[in-house]
């Protein structure tokens, strides 16, 4: 079977709470770093989440 193009990434909260989401993205079509506004349950607000590598 062929390997998939999608890679696992981690979206880390910019609020500094340590909260993160995991998702996948296609590095071939979207080589730039992902930034999304998502809900951070620790501070109970919508904040910017930035892409980081999964260790």
Swiss-Prot record:
InterPro entries: Ribosomal_bL33, Ribosomal_bL33_CS, Ribosomal_bL33_sf, Ribosomal_zn-bd
GO molecular function, one term: structural constituent of ribosome
One annotated Gene Ontology cellular component of this protein: cytosolic large ribosomal subunit
Keywords (A to Z) from UniProt: Ribonucleoprotein, Ribosomal protein
Pfam families referenced in this protein's UniProt entry, alphabetically: Ribosomal_L33 (PF00471)
Record has Ribosomal protein as a keyword: yes
Any one biological process term the GO annotation gives: translation
Family matches, as PANTHER family: 54S RIBOSOMAL PROTEIN L39, MITOCHONDRIAL, LARGE RIBOSOMAL SUBUNIT PROTEIN BL33M
Family named by the database record: Belongs to the bacterial ribosomal protein bL33 family.
Entry-linked HAMAP family: Ribosomal_bL33
Protein name per the record: Large ribosomal subunit protein bL33
């Amino acid at each position: 079977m062929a390997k998939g193009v999608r890679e696992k990434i981690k979206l880390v909260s910019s609020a500094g709470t340590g909260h993160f989401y995991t998702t996948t993205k296609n590095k071939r079509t979207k080589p730039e770093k992902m930034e999304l506004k998502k809900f951070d349950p620790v501070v109970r607000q919508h904040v910017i989440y930035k892409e980081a590598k999964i260790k």
